[in-house]
Amino acid sequence: MIMVQSTFQLNPESKNSVMTLMKEMVGLCREEHGCISYEYYEGITDSCQIILLQEWENADCLQEHYRTEHMADFLEKLSAFLKTPVSTRSYVSEESKISAPTINEKRKPEQTIH
């Protein structure tokens, strides 16, 4: 599974336009092959900070997503509303490593998230 986290800051006057754009994008992306989840959130202390979280079955599905017409259209429209560049991080998770360990596996220490 591939997880993608994108964060960006909006110009305050563009927030309503971007929320409409984001809702459209979520609907389109959730229909794509390999999309497990596609969600966006506003910052708690700054409602102009947007965090986009995506989960994809694999890298091929994510690359297909990047090549869609609606992705190109979204990025073109979004760029006019940004106060800061988009910051993106990607993570890979193997399903077997996040499931419960078998009786013969030693449990790794819990990871602390900051």
Language-model segments: residues:
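Short, well-ordered beta-strand segments in beta-rich or mixed alpha/beta enzyme
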Residues: I2-F8, E39-Y66
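Generic alpha-helical hydrophobic packing signal
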Residues: M3-Q9, V18, Q49, L53-E55, ...
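Non-catalytic surface loops within mature trypsin-like serine protease
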Residues: L10-P12, N58, V92-E95
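Short alpha-helical
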Residues: E13, T45-S47, E69-D73
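Intrinsically disordered, low-complexity acidic/polar segments
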Residues: K15-S17, C61, K97-S99
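Glycine-rich beta-strand-turn "strand-cap" elements at beta-sheet edges
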Residues: Y40-D46, E76-H114
